[in-house]
Amino acid sequence: MAEITIYQKPTCSTCRQAMQLLKESGKPFTAINYYEKPFTKAQLKNLLKKAGLSPKDILRTKEDIYKDLGLAKKNLSDDEWLDTLVAHPDLIQRPIVEKGEKVILARPAESVKELL
């Protein structure tokens, strides 16, 4: 059985809720704070591919950095969006949960149950 990995930010309430659900399940999992261990471009691209999502699908458009960089007005390629997300992790929706070949954006947190 594949182990579950949750990519999260400890101060995020949705991440904390998803982590609590994982703990309650009793299933083994690994929690990765992607601020301490940042995504590589290849890693994020692979996670998005497994999830069937594009970089824009996980973009946090209400973050100050989104506005500061003028991203709403930019027409970037997926590759350029990946570079932007890796450079500015605050722009990444969270948590991202991986189990083998399946990846989900666990919003709401209860959606993590799909992987249990």
Label each region the model flagged.
Residues 1-21, 25, 29-34:
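Local sequence-structure signature of Cys/Sec-based thiol-disulfide redox active-site neighborhoods
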Residues 36-116:
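Thiol/selenol-based redox catalytic cores and closely related redox-interacting motifs
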